Amino acid sequence: MSRFLNNKLRRYGMRAMLSLVLSALGIAAGSSNEVAADASVKASIETSKGVIELNLYSDKAPLTVANFVNLVERGYYNGLVFHRVIPDFMIQGGCPDGRGTGGPGYTFADEFDSSLKHDAPGILSMANAGPRTNGSQFFITHVPTPWLDGKHTVFGRVTKGQSVVDAIKGNDKINKITLSGDTAGV
């Protein structure tokens, strides 16, 4: 695992443990189908079909958001394509070889929060090949996909541009991804 992710894991490890303990004691807020994203970090995906705006859940999936922010800041996603598009399911991008088999050269663990579900269109989640295989690939849903809960880390939600998500076809381009908000705190 990269030094960047190790530092983030150490930084958020205590927070995650505290959250787990509070949840076990029933002190944390109850779950809801409408989870408010931490609006302090936002992403904007400029595609060949238009712009998709997202809020990221840096408070509930800190390692995943930190990884995504790091890759965006390095320009990793710029020029890649949505290599896997399944109508009435999802669009997937983030593979450097455009075939769904590549990644950034490392993997990291899943982050599951019981309040984050694949319960609506526009859920931003990590694509993976099984437990602990997250890297750079992500997907955005067209419809609710509850069978993915507990298998793929949810780390954001579309706030504007779901029609763009729905218009994306295979090999449509990610021109660039930009961030706004407090990315220094991620």
Language-model features: where?
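Cyclophilin-like peptidyl-prolyl cis-trans isomerases
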Residues: 2-11, 15-186
